[in-house]
Regions:
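Substrate-binding pocket helix/loop in short-chain dehydrogenase/reductase
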Residues: 103-105, 112-114
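C-terminal helical subdomain
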Residues: 181-184, 188-189, 204-242
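Residue(s) in the substrate-gating loop at a strand-loop-helix junction
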Residues: 148
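Active-site helix of classical SDR
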Residues: 128, 164
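Conserved glycine-rich Rossmann-like NAD(P)H-binding loop of the short-chain dehydrogenase/reductase
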Residues: 34-50
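Conserved glycine-rich cofactor-binding loop
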Residues: 13, 20-22
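The beta1-alpha1 cofactor-binding region of Rossmann-like NAD(H)/NADP(H)-dependent oxidoreductases
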Residues: 66-78, 110
């Protein structure tokens, strides 16, 4: 039986995108609590600093780095900084995402389509493209993509969000096969309704929805899995139907 450790991620570096609030903040705090140095990426420096303070107050380590995942040069700059400062990238959590749930597809403005796809899909591609080489060189690493059950089901008035998450699931499965020979694990989490500002939860009981911490616990489970195996996909649902 594998011995449990209080700090199983001690010495590891975890990059979390969209770490300023909601699911991303919860994931960053969870990984820091397990001993990882967390690199907090996002566009809102104030929110990132708030997450960093929560981590520091709990005895963890965090570094705030401004990053726009839709801008390749911005992501590459963060990867270069991580390599310079730490020399490694053990965990990459692609969490940054936006939604659009206000109209059917035929009424959706083209710029709304572009914004969602650029963040939810192109941004993940940019991050994997920038950080995977470090993992390949180290022959070790774990990439966790935060998708959605909307990437498994139809979502009326949310077609672009659903399409971006279906695409993210396909990307995740393919990259998992591409990187397995390099000893790199790729997992995708598909949560149901999570009580965050992104989720369209009007009329739903928050007590019956997933909380950001629920997703964070799953990330922790994945990245502390014994190295000879990995969980490729997790479908996460609230126990009680909202």
């Amino acid at each position: 039986m594998r011995k449990a450790s209080q700090n199983p991620l001690q010495g590891q570096v975890a990059i979390v995108t969209g770490a300023g609030r909601g699911i991303g903040s919860a994931i960053a705090r969870e990984l820091a609590g397990l001993g990882a140095v967390t690199v907090l990426c996002g566009r809102g420096s104030k929110l990132l600093e708030e997450t960093a303070k929560l981590i520091a107050d709990s005895g963890g380590q965090a570094k705030v780095v401004a990053c726009d995942v839709t801008d390749l040069s911005s992501v590459e700059s963060v990867a270069a900084r991580v390599k310079r400062d730490f020399g490694r990238a053990d965990i990459l959590v692609n969490n940054a995402g936006i939604g659009s749930f206000a109209s059917p597809l035929h009424q959706l403005p083209p710029d709304s389509w572009e914004k969602v796809m650029n963040t939810n899909l192109r941004g993940v591609y940019y991050c994997i493209r920038s950080f995977a080489p470090m993992m390949i060189d180290a022959r070790s690493g774990h990439i966790v993509n935060i998708s959605s059950l909307a990437g498994k089901n139809a979502l009326p008035n949310g077609a672009v969000y659903s399409a971006s998450k279906w695409g993210l699931n396909g990307l995740s499965y393919s990259v998992a096969e591409e990187l397995r020979s390099h000893n790199i694990r790729v997992s995708v989490i598909c949560p149901g309704s999570v009580h965050t500002k992104l989720s369209p939860h009007e009329g739903k009981d928050p007590q019956k929805m997933l909380q950001p911490e629920d997703v964070a616990h799953v990330v922790a489970m994945l990245v502390t899995q014994a190295p000879q195996s990995f969980v490729s996909e997790v479908l996460l649902r609230p126990t009680l139907k909202p």
